[in-house]
């Protein structure tokens, strides 16, 4: 269990999890409000 926590707290694993969470939030936000993310220039 200690080794698993040490592995999960390494930077590449944390970065991957953070990117997946961020992408999920953006996808869900874009599903409900499709026009708010892309403003016309």
UniProtKB/Swiss-Prot annotation:
Its membrane topology: Single-pass membrane protein
Family assignment from sequence similarity: Belongs to the PsaJ family.
Any one Gene Ontology cellular component term annotated for this protein: photosystem I
Gene: psaJ
Ranges annotated as spanning the membrane: 7-27
Domain of life: Bacteria
GO BP: photosynthesis
InterPro entries: PSI_PsaJ, PSI_PsaJ_sf
Annotated compartments: Cellular thylakoid membrane
Task of the protein: May help in the organization of the PsaE and PsaF subunits.
PANTHER family named in the record: PHOTOSYSTEM I REACTION CENTER SUBUNIT IX (PTHR36082:SF2), PTHR36082
Organism lineage: Bacteria, Bacillati, Cyanobacteriota, Cyanophyceae, Oscillatoriophycideae
Name of the protein this chain belongs to: Photosystem I reaction center subunit IX
Source species: Trichodesmium erythraeum (strain IMS101)
Primary site of residence: membrane
Keyword terms of this UniProt record: Membrane, Photosynthesis, Photosystem I, Thylakoid, Transmembrane, Transmembrane helix
């Amino acid at each position: 269990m200690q080794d698993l926590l040490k592995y999960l707290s390494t930077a590449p694993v944390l970065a991957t999890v953070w990117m997946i969470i961020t992408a999920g939030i953006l996808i869900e936000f874009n599903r409900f409000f499709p026009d708010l993310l892309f403003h016309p220039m």
